[in-house]
Amino acid sequence: MYHRMAHESQPNPLLPGYSFNAYLVAGLTPILAEGPLDFFIDRPDGMKGYIINLTMKGQGQIFDGDETFFCNPGDLLLFPPKSTHFYGRSPSSDCWYHRWVYFRPRAYWADWLEWHTKSSGIGRMSLPNNQLLLEFDRLFANIEQTQRSGRRFSEELGMNLLERLLLRAMEEDPQSPQKIMDPRVIEACQFITSNLAGELRIDEVARHVCLSPSRLAHLFREQVGINILRWREDQRVIRAKLLLQTTQESIANIGRVVGYDDQLYFSRVFRKRVGVSPSDFRRRSSEINYPAAKTLPVAWGEQIPHAVSS
């Protein structure tokens, strides 16, 4: 059981003070004209992860000036990390209901996050009929319900549902490439990610996906671009960075959680890949995200006359 950092002051992502230091957060934002959520979100520097957004009812306005575009029921948007967020209810609509999922992707999702239609860096696609809108509504709702369930593996199950949503989006995008990563490579990645604390051998992974070790090694490098052991090390460091940012666990415990029983070896690997020691990374992350002289950033929710910055 991890101990969350005390900086997160309240658990509602629609209200100020919520920390998005998680792999997955999902919700529904029901904006009504003159209601408590009727303001424009303004995040000039974006967020650390992605947000995928589905308009269910009404109309939303994205950006202003020459870059303005609007989203209607069935429109999907994908905001990449660090991309500018400026959006709210369209003045010509009395409401904007949109489902959303904030997430930090698994490494092998990269191709699924390259949407081919974009406006100012924001991925866009439209579901062509109401049947698809209802299907995607259920996918978003299932992710939210699972993520909030408090079940033992709620985050992992939510990520698996999100994976399905992203693949369905690719299927419905007429401009997406026909070739998607081999499902055996995807399964190998999932198996490795689920067992980061252990020392899985390549032959164990190969047996899990019903391939020979040599065939898996060749296929993995061909489709992912690096070998299996290097990819596993990447995932361990990514997981360690998140735990350093969002928990109060000791560095030794975090090392063990991601597969390094020797704290000194963990620190050496971390420094080699990140450029600083785990303790320095935690300190710098805390200083950046929670500076002592400033209040917590607003996320999703404080009503002011024109916009909310975060």
Swiss-Prot record:
Location within or outside the cell = Cytoplasm
**GO CC terms for this protein?**
cytoplasm
HTH araC/xylS-type domain segment(s): 186-284
Instruction: Write down the DNA-binding region ranges.
Output: 203-224, 251-274
UniProtKB keywords:
Activator, Arabinose catabolism, Carbohydrate metabolism, Cytoplasm, DNA-binding, Repressor, Transcription, Transcription regulation
GO annotation (BP), single: arabinose catabolic process
Its principal location?
Answer: cytoplasm
Molecular function GO labels: DNA-binding transcription factor activity; sequence-specific DNA binding
Tell whether Repressor is among the UniProt keywords.
yes
**Record-linked InterPro entries:** AraC-bd, AraC_XylS_family_regulators, Homeodomain-like_sf, HTH-like, HTH_AraC, HTH_AraC-typ_CS, Tscrpt_reg_AraC-type_HTH
Chain residues that bind alpha-L-arabinopyanose = 13, 29, 43, 87, 98
NCBIfam families linked to this entry: PRK10572.1
Q: Which PANTHER family match?
A: HTH-TYPE TRANSCRIPTIONAL ACTIVATOR RHAS, HTH-TYPE TRANSCRIPTIONAL ACTIVATOR RHAS-RELATED
Q: What does this protein do?
A: Transcription factor that regulates the expression of several genes involved in the transport and metabolism of L-arabinose.
Give the record's subunit note. Homodimer.
Can you name this protein?
Answer: Arabinose operon regulatory protein
Native source species: Dickeya chrysanthemi
Record gene name: araC
